[in-house]
């Protein structure tokens, strides 16, 4: 809207001229402040420079005061104060901010739309905007905080790079320290290579002997399989089992639980040892052994590390003889090295069976492991079918059980070398009758002794 400048009359009084100019300027100010100029600016059409500015000097020639005020009003109407401040701030930021950040700011400015409240409702219905505002896309919304995201990403990348660098330096220092330390500092020779779930677990050393015994047991079983043909290796394996049991448990171990069950530990979520399995069962076995007769402990120490089978070689009762043969065949099939004690050939074994069974009758066969009673022929056959007997006798497996003694032929008994089985005393002669009742004291009642190789 262009306001024409009224011509200034040369004639007339000065008061009328002043009033005419005042009314024109007042109308012009009301038009500028009414909001119509903002409505014109809201349209997408480019604004042209106002022609009233060119005619300004002609109308301002009469009064300099009114001319300066009119020029200020026209400039304020053509260019809002907020836009001037924004342009000034952009010029200042343009000298400080990078080009990429300025480009993001311009993109955000393109999505801003000024809502016009002074436009009438009828004009809003008729007027169609040249450019329909689009909904801001998620990419546009994400770009509003692009500068902050870039700063955070750069900072995180720097932190990760520093962490990786320091971690590599720490690992290099740890490797150098571990190589400089002697090998004896690592417990069991493999503790330095353990990857702990928690850093504090490296300072815990609970039940270290159990892991060492487990490795020693596997190594000992391999050595026993290779070098158990001689008597020296047998004594070494027996002493190894004895030492292992003393380290694991102070009392008597229940052999029915198996040898591997004594080494299984109860661990928490952090990996710390909270207990050992079957300790209560072993304690009960110890209590029951102590409650038996006083000579029971002697049998326990006598049969420590051995598998003892009481049998008979008398074939009059075929059922008993067959049961004894079946049990011996099962033990040989499992490659178990056992000691056979024939109650028919030795009265001493008969008395020993009566003491162990706490009965006047002797029933064979009977199997004992580590001095603990396992059962008769039916129990052994049932355990063999279920596979429990194999696990029970696994520590006593030996290749020496397949070989037959060349001295006694597998009977474990030999004639007495002193009396040659006659039971005659060496002090007896054929010329006097005083020493007829003398008998050999080096052998049993039938003139037999135990095989020195078996």
From Swiss-Prot:
Biased composition (Low complexity): 58-69
Biased composition range(s): Polar residues: 33-45, 70-84
Amino acid composition bias (Basic and acidic residues), ranges on this chain: 217-227
SUPFAM superfamilies, per database record: Thioredoxin-like
GO BP field: sensory perception of sound
InterPro entries per UniProt: Glutaredoxin (IPR002109), GRXCR1 (IPR042797), Thioredoxin-like_sf (IPR036249)
Domain Glutaredoxin: 295-400
Region (Disordered): 30-88, 217-239
Family label: Belongs to the GRXCR1 family.
PANTHER family recorded: GLUTAREDOXIN DOMAIN-CONTAINING CYSTEINE-RICH PROTEIN 1 (PTHR46990:SF1)
Protein name: Glutaredoxin domain-containing cysteine-rich protein CG31559
Organism the protein comes from: Drosophila melanogaster (Fruit fly)
Phylogenetic lineage: Eukaryota, Metazoa, Ecdysozoa, Arthropoda, Hexapoda
């Amino acid at each position: 809207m262009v306001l024409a400048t009224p011509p200034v009359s040369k004639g007339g009084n000065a008061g009328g001229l002043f009033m005419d100019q005042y009314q024109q300027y007042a109308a012009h100010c009301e038009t500028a402040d009414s909001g119509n100029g903002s409505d014109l600016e809201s349209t997408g059409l480019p604004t042209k420079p106002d022609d009233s500015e060119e005619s300004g000097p002609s109308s301002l020639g009469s009064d300099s005061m009114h001319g300066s005020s009119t020029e200020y009003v026209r400039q304020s109407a053509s260019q809002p104060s907020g836009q001037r401040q924004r342009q000034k701030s952009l010029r200042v930021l343009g000298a400080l901010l990078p080009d990429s950040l300025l480009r993001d700011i311009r993109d955000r400015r393109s999505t801003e739309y000024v809502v016009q409240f002074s436009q009438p409702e009828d004009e809003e219905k008729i007027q169609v905007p040249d450019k329909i505002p689009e909904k801001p896309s998620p990419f546009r919304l994400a770009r509003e905080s692009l500068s902050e995201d870039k700063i955070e990403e750069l900072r995180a990348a720097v932190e990760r790079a520093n962490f990786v660098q320091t971690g590599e330096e720490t690992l290099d220092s740890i490797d150098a320290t571990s190589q400089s330390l002697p090998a004896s500092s690592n417990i069991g020779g493999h503790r330095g290579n353990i990857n702990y779930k928690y850093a504090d677990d490296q300072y815990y050393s609970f039940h270290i002997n159990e892991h060492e015994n487990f490795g020693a047991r596997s190594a000992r079983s391999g050595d026993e399989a290779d070098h158990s043909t001689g008597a020296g290796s047998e004594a070494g394996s027996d002493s190894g089992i004895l030492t292992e049991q003393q380290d694991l448990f102070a009392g008597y171990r229940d052999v029915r639980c198996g040898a591997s069950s004594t080494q299984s530990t109860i661990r928490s979520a952090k990996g710390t040892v909270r207990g050992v399995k079957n300790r209560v069962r072993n304690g009960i076995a110890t209590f029951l052994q102590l409650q038996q007769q006083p000579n029971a402990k002697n049998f326990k120490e006598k049969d420590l590390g051995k598998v003892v089978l009481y049998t008979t070689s008398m074939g009059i009762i075929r059922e008993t003889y067959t049961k004894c043969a079946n049990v011996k065949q099962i033990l040989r099939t499992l490659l178990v090295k056992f000691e056979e004690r024939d109650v028919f050939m030795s009265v001493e074994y008969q008395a020993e069976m009566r003491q162990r069974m706490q009965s006047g009758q002797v029933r064979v066969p009977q199997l004992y492991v580590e001095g603990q009673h396992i059962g008769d022929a039916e129990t052994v056959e049932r355990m063999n079918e279920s596979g429990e007997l194999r696990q029970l006798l696994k520590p006593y497996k030996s290749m020496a059980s397949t070989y037959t003694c060349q001295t006694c032929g597998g009977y474990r008994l030999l004639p007495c070398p002193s009396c040659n089985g006659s039971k005659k005393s060496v002090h007896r002669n054929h010329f006097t009758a005083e020493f007829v009742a003398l008998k050999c004291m080096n052998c049993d009642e039938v003139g037999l002794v135990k095989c020195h190789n078996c």
